[in-house]
Amino acid sequence: VQTCALPIWLPYEDIESFHRSFNDVYKMEPEQLQLGFLKVLKGSYMEEMKQKYGLLSQSKPPYEVLRTNWLSYEEVIRLKGVEEMVEVYYNSGQFRRTMKYLVQEWGDAFDLYDRLAAFYEEEGLNGVSHNRLARYEILYLFIQKWGNKEISYQDLLIYDLYLRENVKSRPSFAPDPSEWKNETKQFFMREAKERRYLKGYEAYDSRQMAKMAHLERMEDGSFVLFDYKNQIGRAS
């Protein structure tokens, strides 16, 4: 796994310079982007420089920096929010396509995650244990408020959701799959005869294949087939 570590607090670094550094590293598209809050350990060089750099740190482990001459306490808390959003919506790998389009639309990766963290705070969503589906619901609400309505983020979110696993519970914004129940049945019956899309399913009949794969209709009427045996999601 390619991991890029971006330390939060270096001498003379303010929030604007960190903003630029974040965007530069984000453009590299690492698999993991780790934001690290530097610590002031007892007996360390950083402890010796506390007065010079205006460091205020936690008095108990993990001894993280809370304020510097260049970063206020409020800005450190703000960066904590960005760190949390990066962990949930980037490092988890569960929202790759949706976030890619959002960042392209936003034009500034740091600003997007910063705004998303502010949204969590405004909506009272912090300090709550959210399951995976709830994270999709929250991101959809955020997009409804701030995103481009011309881009089908509903499709992107559903694609990201099903690409990972064949979920049984669907988010509230997802259409009812019974709307294309007949098309799904016909597709798998045809696939059982023609063996056109699902490679390696030769030993399975149409009903078994329907449980092992998923057919999703997009907003434009096209279909995407999710092949979980081979870990593929593609237009059918």
Locate predicted features.
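Residue-level detector of conserved catalytic or cofactor/ligand-binding positions
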Residues: 2-4, 231-236
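Radical SAM enzyme core and accessory elements
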Residues: 84-234
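A structural motif corresponding to the C-terminal lobe/cap of the Radical SAM core domain
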Residues: 1-114
